[in-house]
UniProtKB/Swiss-Prot annotation:
Record: active site: E355, H386, K514
Reaction equation(s) it catalyzes: alpha-D-glucose 6-phosphate = beta-D-fructose 6-phosphate
Protein name: Glucose-6-phosphate isomerase
PROSITE patterns per UniProt: P_GLUCOSE_ISOMERASE_1 (PS00765), P_GLUCOSE_ISOMERASE_2 (PS00174), P_GLUCOSE_ISOMERASE_3 (PS51463)
Lineage, highest ranks first: Bacteria, Pseudomonadati, Pseudomonadota, Gammaproteobacteria, Enterobacterales
Enzyme Commission number(s) of this protein: 5.3.1.9
Annotated keywords: Cytoplasm, Gluconeogenesis, Glycolysis, Isomerase
GO BP terms, alphabetized: gluconeogenesis; glucose 6-phosphate metabolic process; glycolytic process
GO MF annotation terms: carbohydrate derivative binding; glucose-6-phosphate isomerase activity; monosaccharide binding
Domain of life from the UniProt record: Bacteria
Any Gene Ontology CC annotation: cytosol
Protein's gene: pgi
CDD domains, alphabetized: SIS_PGI_1, SIS_PGI_2
Organism this protein belongs to: Pectobacterium atrosepticum (strain SCRI 1043 / ATCC BAA-672) (Erwinia carotovora subsp. atroseptica)
Length: 549
């Protein structure tokens, strides 16, 4: 990967000049000028997904200049470097190969000259065997009962991805009840365990190093809870499995290392649901559905690696995001899935994007002089419409939005889905085109309102419009289409990081707080007054000590 400051490129300067001409252009004008705008600014993927980006403040010239930026920062070489197993995570000296985990073509992918696919396939086969024994009832707990509940204990990438996928694909779930514990707050593990039976519960401890503080604290509490009933530590092996690479620590915990599922340092946490971290997905949905999830992602991988930039969906969405973030000053992006099963999708990519591209140092080690990762947030529609859409429609912040919906519902009750999708279509139309003062006044007049009433209220009912959106319409939410959708966003994030000259696959920003917490924890053991920090931190710790007693 080349280390090029994007803001110093000719393409960036051309975009700045172009922005000056575009900043006051209305989306409504762009549609008026081009009756085929939808056809010109939309694309389909695999007859499963339609991406409509026509309701953006862009023209063909805009896209041409954005593509020039991608070429000048050598995006094609960056894409090739990732797929070739080069160590593009330079600060940790690691390759970045989540694409290998779903490489259904099984073509060789080399790291340090060694094909990783045999090991990937071996772990998949091991997970298949384990999951079939648990799901089929062959795996028994210590009293001979079959497993009814599975608790995944992990945090960050070891929790967010599996939780999101098992929720999104809940229509495909089997009889096993899935639970996810992440927070070190004891309430999370305590409330999860309350209704469970130790004799029929299986725990998955997801920690690559088997040292993650939150995860291991919860794992030891789960083990203590289990042993209160089981009494004998030898029974731990029947009720705990590990998603880890630390065989020594796993064995010391009491887990049979035959039930330890490994992954590799080229798997980043927030890209790990495709790895052994996805064992909870397999236990919930079955191995066949997990394979379909992998296949959908692999299809998007092939699209990303081989499709020209002008038709490459992750590249298109990435470039449009850079356009708003760096030229319009938009600081956030909203992800708005019109599907209740997808209620964790925005939270998943909040981590995926913000932990990846929330960087202020470029690949040369210099402070950046441009915007990098945006703030990601969102909720399912139509809930969001009754919560925060007011600001998106009429506030002073520009919030580009991704609207996501399936054409077919898993729960076709009455006319629920038609009503849901009518809101999906209406919101993007309203955001783009708004409502003028003239239309508002005409509506008031038609309703018999007086001129005074019109003058008094009309200004507050005007919608400026010109709020940009992408619409992503899926045939339905299946393991395959969800896999493709997740990979679409992953590659969008990668593309933006590559162009913006930052390291997308490290996360040093999470480390300082951990270090300080490890220093503070021993200070909380006694009731003595603390004075080793700043006055604020000292004051908070000392008040905590006074109040906890």
């Amino acid at each position: 990967m080349k280390n090029i400051n994007p803001s110093q490129t000719a393409a960036w300067q051309a975009l700045q000049t172009h922005f000056d001409a575009m900043k006051d252009v209305k989306i409504s004008e762009l549609f008026a000028q081009d009756s085929d705008r939808f056809a010109h600014f939309s694309a389909t993927f695999d007859d499963q997904m339609l991406v409509d980006y026509s309701k953006n403040r862009i023209t063909a010239e805009t896209m041409g200049k954005l593509h020039a930026l991608a070429r000048e920062t050598d995006l094609p070489a960056a894409i090739h470097a990732m797929f070739a197993g080069e160590k593009i995570n330079r600060t940790e000296d690691r390759a970045v190969l989540h694409v290998a985990l779903r490489n259904r073509s099984n073509t060789p992918i080399l790291v340090d000259g060694k094909d990783v696919m045999p090991e990937v396939n071996a772990v998949l086969a091991k997970m298949k065997d384990f999951s079939e024994r648990v799901i089929g009832g062959e795996w028994k707990g210590y009293t001979g009962k079959t497993i009814t509940d599975v608790v995944n204990i992990g945090i960050g990438g070891s929790d967010l991805g599996p939780f999101m996928v098992t929720e999104a694909l809940k229509p495909y779930k089997n009889h096993l009840n899935m639970h996810f514990v992440s927070n070190v707050d004891g309430t999370h593990i305590a409330e999860t365990l309350k209704p469970l039976n130790p004799e029929t519960t299986l725990f998955l401890v997801a920690s690559k190093t088997f040292t993650t503080q939150e995860t291991m604290t919860n794992a030891h509490s789960a083990r203590d809870w289990f042993l209160k009933t089981a009494q004998d530590e030898k029974h731990v092996a029947k009720h705990f499995a590990a998603l880890s690479t630390n065989a020594k620590a796993v064995g010391e915990f009491g887990i049979d290392t035959n039930n330890m599922f490994e992954f590799w340092d080229w798997v980043g946490g927030r890209y790990s649901l495709w790895s052994a971290i996805g064992l909870s997905i397999i236990l919930s949905l079955g191995f066949d559905n997990f394979e379909k999830l992998l296949s959908g992602a692999h299809a998007m991988d092939k699209h990303f690696a081989s499709t020209p930039a002008e038709k490459n969906l992750p590249v298109l969405l990435a470039l449009i995001g850079i356009w708003y973030n760096n030229f319009f000053g938009a600081e956030t992006e909203a992800i708005l899935p019109y599907d209740q099963y997808m209620h964790r999708f925005a939270a998943y990519f909040q981590q995926g994007n913000m932990e990846s591209n929330g960087k202020s140092t470029d690949r040369n080690g210099n402070p950046v002089d441009y915007q990098t990762g945006p703030i990601i947030w969102g909720e399912p529609g139509t809930n969001g419409q009754h919560a925060f859409y007011q600001l998106i429609h009429q506030g002073t912040k520009l919030v580009p939005c991704d609207f996501i919906a399936p054409a077919t519902s898993h729960n076709p009750l009455s006319d629920h889905h038609s009503k849901l999708l009518s809101n999906f279509f209406a919101q993007t139309e309203a955001l783009a085109f708004g409502k003028s003062r003239e239309v508002v006044e005409a509506e008031f007049t038609a309703a018999g309102k007086s001129a005074k009433e019109v003058e008094h209220v009309a200004p507050f009912k005007v919608f400026e419009g010109n709020r940009p959106t992408n619409s992503i319409l899926l045939r339905d939410i299946t393991p395959y289409s969800l896999g493709a959708l997740i990979a679409l966003y992953e590659h969008k994030i990668f593309t933006q990081g590559a162009i913006l000259n930052i390291f997308t696959f490290d996360q040093w920003g999470v480390e300082l707080g951990k270090q300080l917490a490890n220093r503070i924890l021993p200070e909380l053991e006694s009731d003595s007054t603390i004075d080793s920090h700043d006055s604020s931190t000292n004051g908070l710790i000392n008040r905590f000590k006074a109040w906890r007693n």
